[in-house]
């Protein structure tokens, strides 16, 4: 039995997934996914979000069935910890700190950086390296920087079969690299983004941690389910000894004057009756 997306419109609404950006900051190409304009904000059609999410789940299961890997990409503050945790749990690769140019189009350079990281670790572990305390401290600092940037792709030895991106506008370099190589892109897309380069659009609020977490968890569960059904072992892309010290990430307030404000957020519950009519707008 295949994985079934059980997410509901009510859950999406409660997470704030319906809040788009101010009407002055929209991308007209997102019009098919917009339900209405309210108080200067565009409201995303959550019925279409749910429909697109179900298609995304099917795409993920196909990718896993073809024995291809997935690369989760989300480097902005609201997404990075969610992306990292989800990728580790489902055993896929991730880029959560920064996108290194050429991560896909120039993998040889990235692999060389990984080799450098491995050499530094050997030097730090060696008791007879002959390095001074100052040199060891500088080496440790360089190690932390490399590990932060390469942690999620350290063991990615071939191109992924799918990119899952949070905010393709913010991650435009990653999307462009995937496009050049013909790698399909699945993305959480807000009303200010261009959906054209995206193969699988999931329209939603990509600025709210609650919204991001809710949707990413569905995608993560789809990966786990597909692997279990196929008998594929779930291996974390990060080995325990490789993990850097984790930083706490606080829930961010909704950005005022940019995406949505608290006043509009509180009105969200009033939109529940309207959501019942979303199907009529398809």
From Swiss-Prot:
Please provide, alphabetically and separated by semicolons, the GO molecular function terms listed in this UniProt record: structural constituent of ribosome
Task: Map out region (Disordered) in residue numbers.
Answer: 245-266
Q: Which GO terms describe its cellular component?
A: cytosolic small ribosomal subunit
- Keyword set, alphabetical order: Ribonucleoprotein, Ribosomal protein
Gene3D superfamilies in alphabetical order:
Glucose-6-phosphate isomerase like protein, domain 1, Helix hairpin bin
Looking at the keywords, is Aminoacyl-tRNA synthetase present?
A: no
What domain of life does the UniProt record list for this protein's source?
Bacteria
Ribosomal protein found in the keyword field: yes
Q: Name one GO biological process term.
A: translation
Which NCBIfam families does the protein's record reference?
A: rpsB_bact (TIGR01011)
**HAMAP family registered for this protein in UniProt:** Ribosomal_uS2_B
What's the family?
A: Belongs to the universal ribosomal protein uS2 family.
Official protein name in the record: Small ribosomal subunit protein uS2
